[in-house]
Amino acid sequence: MYKGYITDIEGIKVGHAQNFDAGTGLTVLIPPKGNTASVDVRGGGPGTRETDLLNPVNTVSEVSAIVLSGGSSYGLAGSIGVVEELEKDGRGFEVPSGIVPIVPQAILYDLDYKSYKIRPDKKMGSEAYKNASFDENRQGIIGAGTGATVGKALGKEFSMKSGLGSATICLGDLKVSAIVAVNAMGDIFDDEKNKQIAGILKNNKFIPTLEVLEKISEKNSLNTTIGIVATNGKFSKTELRKIASMTHNGYARAIRPVHTMMDGDTIFSLATNKVDADINLVGSLGAKVMARAIANAIYF
């Protein structure tokens, strides 16, 4: 297991809500005001909200919250509850008539885990927002990771349970942290130990996903790994887009294969803009801490 949680970065709150019986849930990250955010979507089957707004050429740089959830496209309804709670708190992009909360979201497919009919909704989003705390540190089967599984190329029977993971790296005053819900088709590795820790499990042995794909056409598995990399460093929206891109290297180190046509792999990047930092260093640490967070999604 690796140390740290994304709430180690001052000013960040995290809240979870879930339905354990239905096997689905939602996680919300609420950053401090004055933040900057961007995103990099790599998977071939993404499900997202407000990601176009985070393109560096577009208007808004600051977000009110970021949501990760299960429920596939149905789960996008969860962010509405977060938006409504933010409006009550007076948090959002100012417009002549009031405010518009900016809440990007990414979803994962967990509809086949337990219940197809019960998904994250407005009520669950509101609950997660109200549960948000500066002290939140739970990992595993919680929030967006409630229905997450991995190693699905041979079907549900041989897949393994995954969840939500987080980790932090501190270097002097600089902090880089990640939180991720791991719902990958592929195998999961602890990159720093060069050890497979989850994947297709048959007769108590791992079967490499790539070997399976060489023999069969994997069409039925629907997957996605969705995460956030955050830092207290000072960065522009354009720089954060690059940091999100570099952090995807952490996905590639820990998930094999990754970024397939049936994955919706997405990474949001967030800066609280407190300390001077080098983009190359933070992008490299982002990849390292994301790989650690992915491992923790299995360990916890």
Task: Go through each PLM region and give its residues.
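Short Gly/Thr/Asp-enriched flexible loops that form oxyanion-binding sites at enzyme active sites
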Residues: 78-83
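A structural signal for small-residue-enriched, beta-sheet-centric alpha/beta enzyme cores
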Residues: 1-73, 77, 88-300
